[in-house]
């Protein structure tokens, strides 16, 4: 589904293809839940944390005092927007993966607007409601901006955004040429944003594969800006995922509520607890949902009962923390070179501007 904003209005185009896609996503969710709960080591893809409620809760997490990631990255974007724009060029098409509220990206858009540059922004997210809210807000701030919001996952979102980019420049070409990486520069540059340390949710080898897939869609004059959470004192890390207000608890437990809503589960949320800790050996935060007691859960869509012992857990998310050397190695292994790095004074967070090598 695409939302094309014009003036202050939002038009949503839905069709049979969209309905089929939604059914496919529910089937995929059900299948993954079935595999997870039947396994000895229960683990679900963290993307399932981000339904409508999960996305709203995550935006609240970003406002918590313990969650330094959002405000640190935002300060880097605000401070270095002139440098980023100078390196990338003023004639850019900004594509954001997992855009969420787009609050950080608005800082970059504000600088572009102050320089009288045209704004072309393509937020990609799996939450329709978040896209609607964020794009309406951006249009009120930047009434002349060209914003096309794309409801999609990462894998197909970039392709769809690239096609829309071509249309903004009057470029025409066959669909199978959109992804082709070559040395022919367009009249504009694409800047793909992958912020919020979302790269940390990927396993190390999967992170390489993912960035390689992005690299394959870029021309030599395109760029990728990635946010990395850096390795730091363990107490700072664990506090960020165990906020005193308990928002992260609700965010994690919402996954069980989602299974109840969408798949007819009968999880009793009070019988599970949120547990997040720092795995020193793997340099990652792990999030789990731990059963407080011996229990059985029935899921109607699967027509199955699943047993949990006291202490059994569902592994819901990893968040890897990087060193600067690991960032350099990841970029090289993925077919990128580091054009510029931006790090805060505490060296808690890093933004790397990458270009195809």
Ranges and model annotations:
Residues 236-320, 328-334:
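Substrate-binding/catalytic lobe of Class I Rossmann-like enzymes that use SAM or dcSAM, i.e.
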Residues 42-52, 56-85:
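Class I SAM-dependent methyltransferase Rossmann-like catalytic core
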Residues 2-47:
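N-terminal auxiliary segments of SAM/dcSAM-dependent transferases
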Residues 101-116:
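Conserved SAM-binding loop of SAM-dependent methyltransferases across substrates and taxa
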